[in-house]
Amino acid sequence: MVTAVSPENLKEWHTPSTRPDVIHELIHGVDRYNPSNLPFMEDYLATELKEGQYDLFGNLAILKLYQFNPQHSNPDVIINILIKALAATVSGPDFNLCLEMLREPSAILHDIESADEALVIVMPYLQRLHELSRTCQFTKFWQEINSDSEAAKILRTRYLPQHASPLDDFRFIFSASIASCFRRISLSQLSRWLDIPSDKVGEWCSKVEWTVEGQDAVIPNNGQNDVKAGVVKENVQLGQLTKLVAAAGY
């Protein structure tokens, strides 16, 4: 069932079960800043893309090596890391953590003496997508993805095909965000927010273990979408009240 990210997922976020021991040693060992490890780390990223896995700290380790060894930077790897971070969470820090370790695209290309402008075009575009995702403007997000802009075309034809199921990854994190706020939502709204044809929305609901009632999708309780009234009691001591009244006199 798709729900908002729970604390139980934090360990998997930090140390995913799919991470091989040798990669774990490279990330956390004394050899973590050795640039000769880059080929192994980049191969690990390629496995992430192919298998639909995600290892934020493994990807950050690659960006850290690029930071210390800018001449080894690979623009395609950078873009794929940003795509993985973008597709991992709506409200988490993943994308910004990756972004903070990168300089301007033009500076990166200058260091590696590359004339390929894809990084210059796509990186700001991914930042735009992240802003739309972060602010839950899901319909506009899909409009950007499906647009005829140069950046969108490069993303769709050159990079997304390298990933196992990127569009469904976006749909899953959007569904998690929706599930944290709604108990019931219309299928037509869900179709727009998830960019799914109206006749396929029911299939998606089944995939994420939601039920369909008439023209609505019904989302089970998950601890965040079942708002309950509560009473907060404050125990204010006389001494505290005296200080408050005295402060109000100024």
From Swiss-Prot:
InterPro entries: ARM-type_fold, CSN8_PSD8_EIF3K, eIF3k, PCI_dom, Transl_init_fac_sub12_N_euk, WH-like_DNA-bd_sf, WH_DNA-bd_sf. It comes from the Eukaryota. Belongs to the eIF-3 subunit K family. One of its GO terms (biological process) is regulation of translational initiation. Pfam families: CSN8_PSD8_EIF3K (PF10075). One of its GO terms (molecular function) is RNA binding. Keywords: Cytoplasm, Initiation factor, Protein biosynthesis. Component of the eukaryotic translation initiation factor 3 (eIF-3) complex. Gene3D superfamilies: ARM repeat, domain 1, Winged helix-like DNA-binding domain superfamily/Winged helix DNA-binding domain. GO terms for cellular component: eukaryotic 43S preinitiation complex; eukaryotic 48S preinitiation complex; eukaryotic translation initiation factor 3 complex. This is Eukaryotic translation initiation factor 3 subunit K. Residues 54-235 form the PCI domain. Disulfide bonds: none annotated. The keyword Protein biosynthesis applies.
